[in-house]
Amino acid sequence: MADYHNNYKKNDELEFVRTGYGKDMVKVLHIQRDGKYHSIKEVATSVQLTLSSKKDYLHGDNSDIIPTDTIKNTVHVLAKFKGIKSIEAFGVNICEYFLSSFNHVIRAQVYVEEIPWKRLEKNGVKHVHAFIHTPTGTHFCEVEQLRSGPPVIHSGIKDLKVLKTTQSGFEGFIKDQFTTLPEVKDRCFATQVYCKWRYHQCRDVDFEATWGTIRDLVLEKFAGPYDKGEYSPSVQKTLYDIQVLSLSRVPEIEDMEISLPNIHYFNIDMSKMGLINKEEVLLPLDNPYGKITGTVKRKLSSRL
């Protein structure tokens, strides 16, 4: 029988690159009651902690470990006593708690995702306590803080599905013996936006308003003017245009990462049925799909 405890001792030829442990998908619904007017935040939170020692890994010594069940309970208690003004502020509260409460925690990383509830509204009148789930882009954030430094905050949008039926094309690409894709001047353009940005400072930032502004800018650049749209020669160009517009309009952010899958819709051939399909009936194709990514940041000279 293998002697696991004796065979796997500290190895001087190895070193840790990074360690962490925590609790994922801690779900909370926080209700703020101001008389009969109620406000809600529902979130899913994941917490990762890094400790100053590695004795739990090296020797199976658990004396420094904060149980992950305790981490879960802490998230619940912080929601009660701190509330959830924004998911970014909540993430900072969690990081600060673990770093200030446990001297051997040297790094805290928190991911928070907000479930998209929207208050019911009719004819300009907002309901006092009823909400509807509106999955038109998910707000998420990542907060990381080291013991020796301030929190670093990323915010983002994911699962924002958008489509336009014209004002998009793809021409002038490389053609070789394996190319079957024809050039096209007019096509459907559909994607599911993933967009993440970093704040260069966290004081006096209205995270909720900034997120809403960037979401509006993404939609503005994708769609173009409401009466005529805006032509996109490639997904790459649209991606970059979104980044340029966002960093020019939102001075609080330092960089932006975007991922845009190119979700295909193909014209269905009806010629065998004696019909001409003029891009009226299309076939959505989930897989495979193109994926275009890009990250930009402000040049150092632009920050001086």
Curated annotation (Swiss-Prot):
<dbReference type="InterPro" id="IPR002042">
    <property type="entry name" value="Uricase"/>
</dbReference>
<feature type="modified residue" description="N6-succinyllysine; alternate">
    <location>
        <position position="221"/>
    </location>
</feature>
<dbReference type="GO" id="GO:0005777">
    <property type="term" value="C:peroxisome"/>
</dbReference>
<comment type="pathway">
    <text>Purine metabolism; urate degradation; (S)-allantoin from urate: step 1/3.</text>
</comment>
<dbReference type="GO" id="GO:0006145">
    <property type="term" value="P:purine nucleobase catabolic process"/>
</dbReference>
<keyword id="KW-0597">Phosphoprotein</keyword>
<feature type="modified residue" description="N6-acetyllysine">
    <location>
        <position position="118"/>
    </location>
</feature>
<feature type="binding site">
    <location>
        <position position="170"/>
    </location>
    <ligand>
        <name>urate</name>
    </ligand>
</feature>
<feature type="modified residue" description="N6-acetyllysine">
    <location>
        <position position="175"/>
    </location>
</feature>
<feature type="modified residue" description="N6-acetyllysine">
    <location>
        <position position="278"/>
    </location>
</feature>
<feature type="modified residue" description="N6-succinyllysine; alternate">
    <location>
        <position position="23"/>
    </location>
</feature>
<keyword id="KW-0007">Acetylation</keyword>
<feature type="short sequence motif" description="Microbody targeting signal">
    <location>
        <begin position="302"/>
        <end position="304"/>
    </location>
</feature>
<feature type="active site" description="Charge relay system">
    <location>
        <position position="23"/>
    </location>
</feature>
<feature type="modified residue" description="N6-acetyllysine; alternate">
    <location>
        <position position="23"/>
    </location>
</feature>
<comment type="similarity">
    <text>Belongs to the uricase family.</text>
</comment>
<feature type="modified residue" description="N6-succinyllysine; alternate">
    <location>
        <position position="228"/>
    </location>
</feature>
<feature type="modified residue" description="N-acetylalanine">
    <location>
        <position position="2"/>
    </location>
</feature>
<comment type="function">
    <text>Catalyzes the oxidation of uric acid to 5-hydroxyisourate, which is further processed to form (S)-allantoin.</text>
</comment>
<feature type="binding site">
    <location>
        <position position="236"/>
    </location>
    <ligand>
        <name>urate</name>
    </ligand>
</feature>
<feature type="modified residue" description="Phosphotyrosine">
    <location>
        <position position="289"/>
    </location>
</feature>
<feature type="modified residue" description="Phosphoserine">
    <location>
        <position position="63"/>
    </location>
</feature>
<dbReference type="Pfam" id="PF01014">
    <property type="entry name" value="Uricase"/>
</dbReference>
<feature type="binding site">
    <location>
        <position position="262"/>
    </location>
    <ligand>
        <name>urate</name>
    </ligand>
</feature>
<dbReference type="GO" id="GO:0004846">
    <property type="term" value="F:urate oxidase activity"/>
</dbReference>
<feature type="active site" description="Charge relay system">
    <location>
        <position position="264"/>
    </location>
</feature>
<feature type="modified residue" description="N6-acetyllysine">
    <location>
        <position position="122"/>
    </location>
</feature>
<feature type="modified residue" description="Phosphoserine">
    <location>
        <position position="39"/>
    </location>
</feature>
<keyword id="KW-0659">Purine metabolism</keyword>
<feature type="modified residue" description="N6-acetyllysine">
    <location>
        <position position="27"/>
    </location>
</feature>
<feature type="binding site">
    <location>
        <position position="69"/>
    </location>
    <ligand>
        <name>urate</name>
    </ligand>
</feature>
<keyword id="KW-0560">Oxidoreductase</keyword>
<feature type="modified residue" description="N6-acetyllysine; alternate">
    <location>
        <position position="228"/>
    </location>
</feature>
<dbReference type="InterPro" id="IPR019842">
    <property type="entry name" value="Uricase_CS"/>
</dbReference>
<feature type="modified residue" description="N6-succinyllysine; alternate">
    <location>
        <position position="10"/>
    </location>
</feature>
<feature type="binding site">
    <location>
        <position position="68"/>
    </location>
    <ligand>
        <name>urate</name>
    </ligand>
</feature>
<feature type="modified residue" description="N6-acetyllysine; alternate">
    <location>
        <position position="10"/>
    </location>
</feature>
<feature type="modified residue" description="N6-acetyllysine">
    <location>
        <position position="36"/>
    </location>
</feature>
<feature type="modified residue" description="N6-acetyllysine">
    <location>
        <position position="185"/>
    </location>
</feature>
<feature type="modified residue" description="Phosphoserine">
    <location>
        <position position="232"/>
    </location>
</feature>
<feature type="modified residue" description="N6-acetyllysine">
    <location>
        <position position="164"/>
    </location>
</feature>
<keyword id="KW-0576">Peroxisome</keyword>
